[in-house]
Amino acid sequence: MSLGFIQNDMKMIQRTGTLNFGNVVAESNRHLLGDDWTSEFSDDPNEWRVQKADIVMGCPPCSGWSVWSGPANRGPDSKAHEHTVAFMKYAGRVKPRAIVFECVQQAYTQGRDVMVKYRDMVEQVSGKKYDLYHVKENNLQVGGFSYRPRYFWVAVESGLKFSAVTPEPKELPRIMDIIGDLAEMPQTWNKQKYTAPSPSKWVKHLRTKNGMVDGHIGKTNIHAQRIEEIFSIIGNDGWEGNGDTGGALKKAVDLNDGKFPQKWIDISPRVIRKNFKLGFSQPYRWKEDHWCNVLTGSALDHVIHPTQPRLITHRESARMQGLPDDWNIEESRNYSHLAAVWGKAVPVQAANWIGKALKDALDGNPQGEPAELIGDREYLIDSDKGFSRHYAKKQWYSSPMETSAK
């Protein structure tokens, strides 16, 4: 999320929080994030150093609202919200002109009252009044590569006008527009030359000036080995786009005289018991003529490349999140949570979009239609209204290789 704000000529001065997650990666990319910031993390929010700032921004865990969480861990009383509460209390101590965090849209649709209480919490700590804006957006609509509906909680000094431009796309990219030029490159942590001379217009600006890119390597764990075993039997063309692992595995077993591939033998009784129905979160193959889907923290274990017989790589994940190819990955190769970083991050384009809206507001030049007043100093900006999966698919993805709107 930080890079999108920095792209709007903002300066980061501090990274802090309850979770020291991903900071190793940020430290390796000071050439893009600036070199004037400090980082300090503590379970005790009272230890977070307060500095003068115009904006406090954050990305606390969404698990308290996410449909991926079980009912016992989801809702207004979820323990995961402790991180958001800590964020609010810290923001109140800083007393900035604006505060923003990103979450899934259920935080608004199911937890609007909680969102208002967060504003009240900031006001109580800071002694300042803030106007609350609920901002709904979709990463694909605002210039990103994935169909990713999300929610930005935005609080600005009371009376400060805030709005955001609702984009009207003329074209939208497909996944191979984003990662196609990386597909056939050898896998390595080290820097290597691009092998595809002509990237799509969607990512041309993301390629490095020196023609070298690092971090194009995936996992080699048991999950990756099992996927490779399936491909070794059914072939690359034997696994169709949107096809799940259970279906591909059954095809492999049938072609292998009823025998499970070697790496699958130990779990074969469970697979048979479930009739090859491996559940909602099993690996599946993305379609090459489709948009990028949402990356989760387990993407490198669960996303099978659209055209290559393998799981996706770190660099491909970074690309899909809008990060430039000079975003250093290799230096963080020993960071145990590196694979989870990509799916836990806010896409650069979505961060850039909300960052620009905040900068325009702070500069006294808000853009876009006025927000809808829905409560006491409470507003709604419903940017992705009507931008449904059905609408996007019909408008831009109904023909196999067509990317322009009808």
Where on the chain are the PLM-derived regions?
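Class I S-adenosyl-L-methionine
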Residues: D36-A53, S63-F276
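Short His-Asn-centered micro-motif
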Residues: Q7-N8, F101-C103, G297
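C-terminal target-recognition/interaction regions appended to catalytic cores
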Residues: M212-K406
